Amino acid sequence: MKARVTVTLKSGVLDPQGKAIEGALKSLGVSGVGSVRQGKVFDIELSGFDVAKAEAALKDAADKLLANTVIENYRVEVLS
């Protein structure tokens, strides 16, 4: 089973890396760039889980390891 955990900064949290990427895109001539927010994506392969247990295990992993829940949100998706 494949799953994805996407971690993003919460609204209102400053994102200096996103700002740097935004500036770099503009300096490269990419037009129409409004703002950029950076995040992390974890693609994880699991075995021995049904969908509900996989989601629960990944939410637990995100809470404890993958995301800093003070400043980040996360989304868990089971892909297949």
Summary of predicted features, one role per range:
Residues K2-D43, G48-S80:
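Long, contiguous binding/interaction regions
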